[in-house]
Amino acid sequence: MIKPKAAWAAAACLLLLLAGEIRSATTAVSATVASFCLMAVTSSAVILTVSNPATPGGVPANPTNSGTYAQYSSPVASGVTRRVTAAWATGNSAPTSCSLLLLATVPSGKGTSAGQITISTTAQNLVTGIGGCATGTTGTSGAQLTYTLSIGTITSLVANESKTATITLTLTDS
């Protein structure tokens, strides 16, 4: 007499043999990395004020502001790098006898600082050699931007003169 478990096992094997071959299906999966370059700054306003010197007869210090960061995401094709340029709009200027300077302090692996530049209407390299990277999204992630109002000669400063300039940072292929 055949035991019930053995009978069921034999029946299952017989059904598999009678059912024919096991069928399968395939799916082609296509994955593509889109080309994009995104950039933002963490602050929309920077204020630089020339204040009185600490002692009478002294020269005022050049005001600076390092509270803004440029954040970017940039996958690149093999052999391609990107850069960040900076310029101000036509008609913008610094106060009389002053220049607006900008320096980017770049985190490791996120490009190379071009050093301190003098802002003008001509776009200048601020960060170069940006490969595939994402700088992060927290308030202090990315390339730290230091704006400095450099005083040329104190004798040419105009008291109460105020200028507002729109600085455009552009992330583009090198």
List the predicted regions and their residue ranges.
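Bacterial N-terminal signal peptides
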Residues: 10-17
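N-terminal small/polar-rich segments of proteins
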Residues: 22-112, 116-119, 124-174
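Bacterial N-terminal signal peptides that target proteins for export
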Residues: 1-10
